[in-house]
């Protein structure tokens, strides 16, 4: 899987990320990874479900990985949850 086939979800509206996922599949990608951390995890799940159910009927959720990442902040180390959702045809 190429690094181009990854959509990092942040604070933008859900439909911006859905458009990115649909564009990746329409350009020939067989799999697209949706990645998010922290508060954006619920938005990433929304992106996967909207992409799969409304726009791409033949796409399925192939894998879901959850993890914890350690970030160094000015207040010391902080643990942040992360998710990776793999959609594929």
Swiss-Prot record:
Q: Which UniProt keywords apply?
A: Chromosome, Cytoplasm, DNA condensation, DNA-binding
Entry's Gene Ontology molecular function annotations: double-stranded DNA binding; RNA binding
For this protein, the record's InterPro entries field holds: Alba-like_dom_sf, DNA/RNA-bd_Alba, DNA/RNA-bd_Alba-like
The record's Gene Ontology biological-process terms are: chromosome condensation
Q: Which SUPFAM superfamilies match?
A: AlbA-like (SSF82704)
Compartment list: Cytoplasm; Chromosome
- Does the record bear Cytoplasm in its keywords? yes
- Annotated GO CC locations: chromosome; cytoplasm
Short name of one Pfam family: Alba
Question: Which NCBIfam families does this chain map to?
Answer: DNA-binding protein Alba, PRK04015.1
The free-text function statement in the UniProt record for this protein reads:
Binds double-stranded DNA tightly but without sequence specificity. Involved in DNA compaction.
Family as reported in the entry's similarity comment: Belongs to the histone-like Alba family.
For this entry, the protein name equals: DNA/RNA-binding protein Alba
Q: Which organism is it from?
A: Methanothrix thermoacetophila (strain DSM 6194 / JCM 14653 / NBRC 101360 / PT)
């Amino acid at each position: 899987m190429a690094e181009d086939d990854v959509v990092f979800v942040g604070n933008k509206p859900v439909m911006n990320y859905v458009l990115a996922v649909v564009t990746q599949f329409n350009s020939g990608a067989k799999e697209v990874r949706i990645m998010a951390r922290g508060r954006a995890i619920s938005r990433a799940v929304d992106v996967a479900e909207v992409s799969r159910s409304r726009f791409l009927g033949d796409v399925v959720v192939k894998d879901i990985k959850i993890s914890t990442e350690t970030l160094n902040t000015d207040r010391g180390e902080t643990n942040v949850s992360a998710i990776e959702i793999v959609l594929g045809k």
